[in-house]
Amino acid sequence: MSGFLSGDPRPFRSVRPFAAFLVLAAPFCVSHTALAQTSATDDPTEHLDVPGRRPLDRPAPVGSRLGLSLRDTPATVDTISRDTALQRGALSAEAAADMLPGITSGGSPGNPGQFVLRGFTANEITVLHDGTYLGPVTMVNRPQNSFNLQDIEVLQGPASVLYGQGAVGGVVDERSRDPVLGRRSADLLASYGSFDTWNAGIGVNQPISRDAAVLVDVSRSSSNGYVPGSDPASLDVTGALLWHAPHRVTLRLGLDVLRDQLSSYYGTPLVPAASASFFGGIAGGLLSSGTGLAIARDSLWQNYNVRDFTTTSTSLRPTLRLDWRATDRLTIHEKAYFFYAARRWQNAESYSFIPPGTDAMDAEGNAIATGSIARDRFHVFQNQHQVGDTLDATLDGSLFGLSNRVVAGIDGSYLRFIRDRGFPDAPYADAVSLSDPDRGEYGAFAGDLPSRKSPTDLGDLALFAEDVLSLTRTLKLVTGFRYDWLWLGRDNFNQDGSFNARTSFSGTYHPNNGRVGLVWNATRDITLYGSWTSADDPPGANIFLANRGQFDRLSHAQQAEIGLKAALPDGRADLTLSAYHIERNRMLVATGPDTVSTAGSQHSNGIETQANWRPAAHWTVSANAAWTRARYGSFHPDAATDATGNRPPDVPALVGNLWIVRDHVAGTPVDLGGGWRHVGDRAGDYADTLSLKAYDTVDLFAAYHLRPAVTLYGRIGNLLDRHYVQWADVSYPTEVILGAPRSFSLSLQASF
């Protein structure tokens, strides 16, 4: 397959000399900089981020515009820094977020970068980039390299009061790095590992005056993939210019450019258990099925997609942020942005096993042999243009003689999304062998072209306000409100170009949401809180895929949460604990073969906790766990399926992480660390007839400090080589996504 950056048959292969250069050059570069700074880095932990440590007094931007600390935010906010992610070997934002309480991630190439939070998933989760919403996660999200990020912040639970429609289960904010004034620095990363996986990155922070600095981060990745021939690759360039202008004005101009190619691995097909014996037997420990389905051993790590697959995207996002401290009590903030993305998929996505006694034909009218894997063809081309602006003011003052801070503002955006798609007239395009697939080419099939076009326009204008009132020295009342004027228009065109009035529609919606929270600092180190918050989101359909009758009104969710945040006085340990209940109503349900209504519901209860502890010098321990009980109320995802009382797909009841790190073992420049992760059983479909087995993975790393700021890492991922199902995409009911097997990597990281 031709690379989309060059004619190289392996995209991004040029990352290899780039990475090799970093490996060879970094020690020499640092020998003249880091060595000269030895006196400033004698503390052995100076260059080492403390895994999982979350000082409760630092701000939590994703949780509020009020500038509240983690301690004073009446919600659960979790953060993982770039340094922690890279130390643990998490090179993507999804892998890093998985280390936070209660979060799992997954998705197929058609719906990449999905998250599960508090019993909700897919478009019920809002993913932000530097605080900006770019569309439903299943349509617009792409894996992000963690090298380019400052941190990942997660707000658990409904958050429409802050970010508008869609934020029911929570918000994941992937935040880019900011320039630092007055300090010249550079960061290097070079990594090679199993499956011919390369990662490389370079970041430079350069002051250009006393009041201005520029930062540029560039990262590249390339891999054959743990499923051979899946070939994921990416190039991510992020940069920012920071200027402290006169008159107490700060300007930040940012740019994010991404070109990527997603993995071509759409899944491993399910087969009748009785047929698996002809293909190496059943691969045990992966799933159980009430309808007699299993995974055949011969299908493990097979790629059934076409060789000339397409899963590429190019995106561009410039941003401008202005902060003006007009007076000692009044600050004005403005953020403007533009976003463009072009995405292309052209693949064989669905794989169906043809059991004995079945008559099936391909698109050419040929009989498909039983025991084969029948494939479809599907192409989707997307173009997205979006502009937006947020303007708000923060005022510090008093209310009824009590200390008070209020934020009020306006948020506006316009999004134009054009989706072209096509597929053959026949149910199956062709077929391949289960155990030794000849992947073939995409080809041409009757009915695939011309494309069916569906442009969508989404406009949003919102008024919002937040307030924190200090009722006493230890008691704070935190409130918020947001009113949206949301306009959605979707035009569908038939293959012949004629307008489809039956499915096209337009509508106006007026969601309004709020938050009320009470925060009590019981002692200097112990805080208790309780809160209520709400959210609105599309009732069942993707906002870019909704047709007439599927979007008459928004669904509505409410959450009640209580929690505790505490730390030891000496700062050696901190703990957060929360319990919540979420109700979501007005979900889209099928009431007949061609009729729907918004009568569905879902509820979720859970407990989450995170603890970080330094039991002794050179030791750090980070642990978290989350228990979730999520169930549908009345819910019929289609006319033939009654999911009432069932678990939502891909939602585990229990998720846990444990990381232990020992730095400078026995006084040597060697660090050792290990992590354990548990993910519980999950439903694999709406009917809850497919159950994905629980799994545990163990990761290990050893680090050798060549210089105070140069570290060589060796890692083993999935040490016990546990085979497991990571994800079941309900859009592809005949297949599941397997998780990565055991892997090894060697990397060099340097900062100077």
What are the residue ranges of the model-derived segments?
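Face-selective signature of the C-terminal outer-membrane beta-barrel domain
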Residues: P318-Y340, I373-F493, T576
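Short acidic/polar hinge/loop motifs at secondary-structure boundaries
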Residues: S105, V116, T132-Q156, R175, ...
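Membrane-embedded beta-barrel scaffold of Gram-negative outer-membrane proteins
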Residues: D323-R325, R329-Y337, A341-E349, N521, ...
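Structural signature of Gram-negative outer-membrane beta-barrels, strongest in the C-terminal barrel
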Residues: H244-P246, Q384, S403-V407, D411-L415, ...
